Amino acid sequence: MMRKLFKISEIPQWKILGKEVVDEIIFRTIKPRNRLILELMARGGMRIGEVLKLTPADVDDRKLTLREPKSGRGQEVVFIPQKLADRLKEYIREKEIKSEERIFPTTYTAARVMVKKAGFLAGVHLRPHDLRRHAATFASRSGVPIELVSKTSSAMPIFQRPRGISARSAMLRQ
């Protein structure tokens, strides 16, 4: 009886979304704003908070500058595919967003709900970090050097880090 009470539960493995599933989630999203948010997270490996903080001043063609990222560094740079960069610039132009205004003026909670609904439309339980994890996994499987993937994934690739362990804790263990 006591053994059952204090049984150590097994940590379930994360389910990595396939490229086809992520593409379906993105293409089923109708609103351009929501689609851009999803693509920046899935293709650029950005956190939801980083996407919401973006301003037109941070966008330089394919290079996005993240000011005050969660990692604690002063600035970080994210590179996105050219087609996504073109759509982002077009969105900024169409909406006439000033250089210091946020591109996506929505709350963190509203963005999380949008991501969850996008996953529901595709029949997948989706959380914002699932898209970031997909980006890191896809990059590493595509032959991007592990050091580069690590820099965009909070210092350690997700597939090398035990679940529930932060990047900082994982680095201290090495």
Which positions does each model-derived feature cover?
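Flexible interdomain linker/hinge and immediately adjacent N-terminus
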Residues: M1-D23, R73
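N-terminal DNA-binding recognition helix of tyrosine site-specific recombinases/integrases
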Residues: M1-L5, G45-G49, M114
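DNA/chromatin major-groove-contacting recognition/catalytic segments
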Residues: L5-E10, V78-Q82, R163-Q174
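Basic, Lys/Arg- and aromatic-enriched nucleic-acid-binding interface segment
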Residues: K15-I48
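Short, basic (Lys/Arg/His-rich) helix/loop patches that form interaction surfaces
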Residues: F27, I97-E101, R112-K151
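Short, charged phosphate-coordinating catalytic segments
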Residues: M41-R62, E147-K151
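Short, polar N-cap/turn motifs at the start of nucleic acid-interacting alpha helices
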Residues: V59-D61, H125, V144-I165
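C-terminal catalytic core of Y-nucleophile DNA break-rejoin enzymes
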Residues: S71-E90, K98-K116
